Structures are given as C-alpha cells and as structure tokens.
UniProtKB/Swiss-Prot annotation:
Record-level Gene Ontology MF annotations: arginine-tRNA ligase activity; ATP binding
Enzyme class: ligase
Coiled-coil residue spans: none
Annotated protein name in UniProt: Arginine--tRNA ligase
Family to which this protein belongs: Belongs to the class-I aminoacyl-tRNA synthetase family.
Entries under Pfam families matching the protein: Arg_tRNA_synt_N (PF03485), DALR_1 (PF05746), tRNA-synt_1d (PF00750)
Record's keyword annotation contains Transmembrane helix: no
This protein's record includes keyword Aminoacyl-tRNA synthetase: yes
Amino acid sequence: MNIENYLSETLAKVFQKLGYAESFAKVVTSTREDVGHFQCNGAMPLAKFAKKPPLAIAEEIVEHIDAEDIFAKLEVAKPGFINITLAPKFLADTTNRFLNSNKFGVQNNLPNRKVVLDFGGPNVAKPMHVGHIRSALLGDALQRIHRFCGDTVISDVHLGDWGTQMGMLIEEIKLQSPQLVYFDENYTGEYPTESPITVQELAEIYPRASKRCKSDINEMEKARLATFELQQGRRGYVALWQHFVRISIDAVKKDFDSLDVHFDLWLGESDANKFIDEMISYFQANNFIYEDEGAWVIDTNKDGVPPLIVIKKDGGVMYGTTDLATLWQRSKDLDPDEIIYVVDKRQSLHFKQVFSVAERTKVVSEKCKLKHVAFGTVNGKDGRPFKTREGGVMHLADLISQAKEYAKNRMPDENDDSIIDQIAMATIKFGDLINNYANDYFFDLEKFAQHEGKTGPYLLYTVVRAKSILRKIFGDNYDIKSLAKDYKVVNAHNEYEEKLQLQLIQFPIAVQRAYENSQPHHICEYAYSLANSFNKFYVNCPINNLDDESLKKARIALCMATVKAMTIASDLIGISIPERM
C-alpha cells in the first residue's frame, strides 16, 4: 500500500463531495517534518478554477474530513497547504501490516506486464571497464525492481558483435597471421574448433587495429569490406568471428558474475542479422524506404530528428539497422508490453531515430512502449572520464580489486573474504546507484568506501547492527516471518519511534517512484533515510535492559521491520548483507 496514494484517495472523496476535481487531492510526503507527516497542496492550483482563495478551499476541505482513525491532526497553512499528521495507532497498525506482508507493503502491478530490458551491451574483443558499470548496475536494479513489482522480465545483454570493429580485427589478424585457413577463400574443410588467439591477445589486437584504421583511410576501407563480407556470410570470416564472440562471452560472463549481474538472453547484434532481409522487404512493400544518394533511408516524421540510414551505399548495414531488426525479432518472439534500453545518453539521437521509425513502420505493436534510460557518464574526481592513475581506462576487474582493498583497509582484522566482497560490492553499487541516472557523477572510491555518510558500507553497517540485536535475543536461526505474529509495533512512545515508523511505511512510495521513473536512486535514498532513522532509534531507545515487556517487544518488532525493509531495499539494488561486520 502506497501511503501517499491511500491518503490521496481518502481526500479525493472529500474533494468530490464538495464538487472539486479529485485530481487536486494528491498527497505527498511533507517537506517539513515540523508541520506534519504529509501535505496536500491542491488548494493552490484549484483556486483559479474554483474562483475562491486557496486558504478558504483548504479550510473547507479540512472541515469536511471525518477520519479520526487515520489523522491525528489536520492543519491549514498559508497560502493553502493542508498539513497532515497521522494518528499514532494508524501509523503503528500500518507498520505491523507491512511487517507481516511478503513485500513490506508493496503490491503487484495488475495486469502483469512483459518487459524486455536491454542493458550491459559490452563489445566483443574489448575488456569491460569502469564505463560499463552504469549500464550493468542500473539495468540490473531495474530488472530486480520490475520483477519485484510483478512484471515478467526478459533481460538481454545485446552484445556489440557485428559492427566495423569485427572487420578491423579480421584485417589485423590477417596482417599478423596471413597463413591461417580463415583467409583462404578456396578452403572447403572444417575450421579449427580452438581459437587462434586468446581473449588477452584479442584485447591487445583491437586497440592496434583501431589506431591503424583511424590513421589510414585505406586500412579503414579494408576493415569495412571485411565487415561487409562477414555480414554476407564469408565462411572463413564467420568461423573466425565465432571464435571472437565465444572467447569474449566467456570473459564478459566472469565480469558480470563478479557484479552478481545476470541475463536471461545472451544475444548480440548478429542474432538480428537473419531478420534484416525480411524487414527490408516489408519496408519496401509498404513504401517506407527510399533511395537517397545511393543509400536506403526511412524518414522519422519527427521535427529535428533526421532520417535513419538503413542500408549504406556499399550495401552494408548500420547500427540502426540491427537495432530495428532486433526490435523486429523481439516483437515477433516475445511480444512485450515495453522494451527498455539502458544506454549512455550520447546515444539519445540514435534511439529517437530508431524508436520513431519502429513506431511509424509498426515494427513494434501499438501496445509496446519503447523507452531509453539515457544515463550520464562516470567521471573521476577531476571531473573528467574516470581513468587509472596512469591515465588509462580502468578495467572492471581492477576497480573491484581496489574496492576490496579499501574494504580490507577499513577492516584489517576481517579474514572472511566473502564479507570483504559484500562490502566492496555495496561500495561500488550504492556509490553508483545513489545518483539520478540522467546525471554525470564523480566516482570517488575512497569516499564511497566510508562507513559513515551516504554510502553502501553505512547501509550494511546499519542492517548488521539491527540483525545483531535480533540474534542476541533469538539466536542465529531466527525467522522474522514467524516471530512477527507475536511481536507487534505499538503507538510510538517518543519521536524516535514515531520517525522510524513513519520512515518504514514509506517503502512502497520509494519502490513505486523507482519503478515508474526507472530511477533506483529513490530506493537508495529511502534506504539511507531509514538507516539514519534506525540509528537514532538505536541510540535513544534501549531494548535489552527494559523492564516494560510490552515496550520491549514493540521495539524488537521495529528492529524486525527495519531488517526486513532494508534487506528488501538492498536486494533491489543488488546488494547482499553480511551477518556481521
């Protein structure tokens, strides 16, 4: 139950009764704790329609509200705010209801939707680096959130395995080892099952090939021709390319496993290749495509968005072509209600073109919503793209090692590597996801590793503290679900209990905001606020030495509720919680 929605519905009945539009009854969390828990600001925009002063409207609404079981206090403030304080019993009862629910008050979306999430997107032959973090962590958080809210999610890594970089690699290896059978057009036998190069060699070859092509237009033309021949099915090139893909996927899977990020599908641009001819024929039959200076293009019919080139002058396909073909494939095979792309904001124009063409040509059905979660860049403390101390791009494995080193330095006596791993992951993930995805941000590992402030380790420390209270009382194998039947939250005895209860019941609000806006930072902010509220409660509300047994049980129930809410919130952003720190 989203408490903001519940209160909005309660006030909407009064608005309707008085002849006002229900849409003005929206309740939001108060921006000032000193005046109330929640507030309704609808009287101000309503005033110009009702032709009454907003203060008079607010007073009229409050006068007609009859819900003493929900509200302890309703106050009107200039110029027309309605400040709401919840009744202590309603606050306690709602906390208990959430504690005893499987998802801490969050209800499944109805009807169930099918969502395809396209994220990760590493390129074949390139090691994963710090720049891949945002897509991987943001996409993983979104798939966790969507599943939690009841959607059927199909996640696809969508490998970059079909572009000009493949031709660059082929030409570079041909230059290096021309005797390989992959380059003999007359060869008719079976190609070797073992790759002629390792993934480490592949990672070294690509920068060399890229540099050569950028400095020599003739080399770039060779790479483009090799790419075209690969896409046309030249046997030797296809066999060599298959080695590139296989050894790259093995390495990439290890990197994603280290982040606890997993995918349902491991498809690439190449998997859509077989649909391109069928799709082009469809475009031609319906007069969507036309020739322009030797290339084949489709208009977007959107102001400021240029036409999309589908077939190049040389007959090769573009990145946009394979993206359209991927949408064609997903529509036919999966029939989703929504497809979400978690990709760098520098690709925004590209996705505007692709989405516009896909919708105009009905490559996707009318029910299917297309969304680009366009994230900002990861910068170092100097404000520039994040680099190693030597100035190079930091590989993901090196970043994780650094995070583990920071964790170990802060806990030198900790010998359990699994705990160090959990702290390192919390450091990286929370440090990234606490930021609104649309913004660039500074990746400061030293700051993220602190055990105080808005960090992953602080989050873990708080939950471990709450769990240790329960473990001291119930032993190691306690079960919150069964214990909650006998331990109930009661009306708050002081401000610390009240604020903790208030924070606990806002969990569904954070989840709904994260879900609707594709913004996991709402869950991070919630978890941080809950951690602060619990730590103040912990300091000011003793448990173990209490003589009042009913109060003791009520505070234990608040510890249970905190552990449950924090555990779910942490899982939604891909963070696992150790038993101790």
